[in-house]
Amino acid sequence: MSEQKQDVAATEEQQPVLQIQRIYVKDVSFEAPNLPHIFQQEWKPKLGFDLSTETTQVGDNLYEVVLNISVETTLEDSGDVAFICEVKQAGVFTISGLEDVQMAHCLTSQCPNMLFPYARELVSNLVNRGTFPALNLSPVNFDALFVEYMNRQQAENAEEKSEEEQTKH
């Protein structure tokens, strides 16, 4: 009986763990520098969108992940800035039982994927409060971004290795 309990405990220790501890807004900014005259122009927006993540280990198996979203909208004809919206949506996650690549995937894909709906809603709300037309950000495929990042890393490593071999000869 006690052997079964030990086996179960050992199995539970080996299981990957990903738990949300807290989700919060770390920083938010909304600027509409050309109000009110921007509303007198024809609304032909040009949208600029930037996305990045930051990860910090804050304790044993405890990580803060910050999803940074920046949206800048200008008018096509005049080039005037309609609005700039910046959101840092953050979360603290308990993560354990993962190897290096799995951990990197979790921190740069799974965690941001959980944070994105909160950030998207906040951006939409801020734009709405500025009385601009609705802005609904499309979903982001963080898995594809992670694969792209890993491929770039492998290509850079192969290039560095090739350069090292050429300098040795």
From Swiss-Prot:
Homotetramer, a dimer of dimers. One homotetramer interacts with 1 SecA dimer. The keyword Transmembrane does not apply. InterPro entries: SecB, SecB-like_sf. PANTHER family: PROTEIN-EXPORT PROTEIN SECB, PTHR36918. One of its GO terms (biological process) is protein tetramerization. One of its GO terms (cellular component) is cytoplasm. This is Protein-export protein SecB. It comes from Haemophilus influenzae (strain PittEE). The lineage of its organism: Bacteria, Pseudomonadati, Pseudomonadota, Gammaproteobacteria, Pasteurellales. The keyword Transport applies. Keywords: Chaperone, Cytoplasm, Protein transport, Translocation, Transport. It comes from the Bacteria.
